[in-house]
Amino acid sequence: SIEDCETIKAYINEGIVAGVNKKHLPSCRTPWYSMEQKAVAPIWVSSACRNGIKFVRNLAGAKSLTTFHSVFVHGDFADDVDVIFSYFLTPIAQTIIRENRKELGNGLEKFQPNDLNAANMLNISVITEDDRTKIINIYNEIVLDNRSALLDELNTIFLSYLQ
């Protein structure tokens, strides 16, 4: 156990002396030195980018690294994760989401979690069943073969709901 290991105790004490236990993230954990307990997110988004926001569909159910923010879908839309992910891939969604970003040197765009939370989102409940089927079919093709023509087709469908 942790009490039996003097080197671990000394290491934890160094953290206390340095004030690590008072910093925001560690102070929210019990005990403060434990690993962050994070739920598995179905979609990840890169925290920084230069040429388009990177979205990852977490099909493996892995926990994300710190280079990604987690996107959790409200329970009412749990069956629509692939539709939502498809929307995020489109140029129109990228344009809308980029309105809430900070730009750093050399064109690096940085996103904080609240930047993403504040971004406008298409109300996907207005999408017809016919378009949902098209979107899912395109999504399934993208999973197998990432072609820009498929993204153009997705963009056209979603753009029709934003006009």
Question: Residue spans of the language-model regions?
Answer:
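Nucleic-acid-interacting cores, centered on viral/eukaryotic replication and modification enzymes
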Residues: 144
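Short amphipathic coiled-coil heptad-repeat segments
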Residues: 149-163
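Polybasic, glycine- and aromatic-enriched phosphate-binding surface used to engage nucleic acids
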Residues: 1-141, 151
